[in-house]
Amino acid sequence: MTMDGDSSTTDASQLGISADYIGGSHYVIQPHDDTEDSMNDHEDTNGSKESFREQDIYLPIANVARIMKNAIPQTGKIAKDAKECVQECVSEFISFITSEASERCHQEKRKTINGEDILFAMSTLGFDSYVEPLKLYLQKFREAMKGEKGIGGAVTATDGLSEELTEEAFTNQLPAGLITTDGQQQNVMVYTTSYQQISGVQQIQFS
């Protein structure tokens, strides 16, 4: 009898039965699921791999600092915390505008965000003073890229852009009051990282 009891105990332990689940002659078996734990470990590993540092989602601080230096005297200096602050603000601004433009594309069942979507988003979010100069810049940019394509015959990144920006098309997308000047003098500086490489496109200032 003792041997049978030992045998039962051995069998139970081999099946992973703990004493808490043994009651009388009934056994409750809770096998250890190695597959589930393995999947959980895999998920934890993926989660750690997909985590990014906060700085990784921001614009390069060197580019931000270069733009900031253009607005101060040559002898001026910019502290590191000031650069990081502007870096975060600019990155958040880009995300803010792009999110609104993406929502418009989603409503119109389009997958590509174009220049008009960005301008529409800026006007919707209250950045009306930037719409007119950016509209002109976008038009000049497309004309310059068109000219380069005609001369060299090279395929450029703007091939996927939508129809040429016209006054009529833009008026249909934006309220008329948002794309016309209001008589007040406003200085808006438009920066681009590629204007030096494209003929006909320069840094422009409107007043």
UniProtKB/Swiss-Prot annotation:
Residues 86-97 are annotated as: Subunit association domain (SAD). Keywords: Activator, DNA-binding, Isopeptide bond, Nucleus, Transcription, Transcription regulation, Ubl conjugation. It is found in: Nucleus. Residues 53-142 are annotated as: B domain. One of its GO terms (molecular function) is DNA binding. Residues 39-52 have a biased composition (Basic and acidic residues). There is a cross-link at residue 140 (Glycyl lysine isopeptide (Lys-Gly) (interchain with G-Cter in ubiquitin)). Residues 143-207 are annotated as: C domain. Residues 1-52 are annotated as: A domain. GO terms for cellular component: CCAAT-binding factor complex; chromatin; nucleoplasm; nucleus; protein-DNA complex; RNA polymerase II transcription regulator complex. Belongs to the NFYB/HAP3 subunit family. Heterotrimeric transcription factor composed of three components, NF-YA, NF-YB and NF-YC. NF-YB and NF-YC must interact and dimerize for NF-YA association and DNA binding. Interacts with C1QBP. Can be divided into 3 domains: the weakly conserved A domain, the highly conserved B domain thought to be involved in subunit interaction and DNA binding, and the Glu-rich C domain. This is Nuclear transcription factor Y subunit beta. It comes from Homo sapiens (Human). The lineage of its organism: Eukaryota, Metazoa, Chordata, Craniata, Vertebrata.
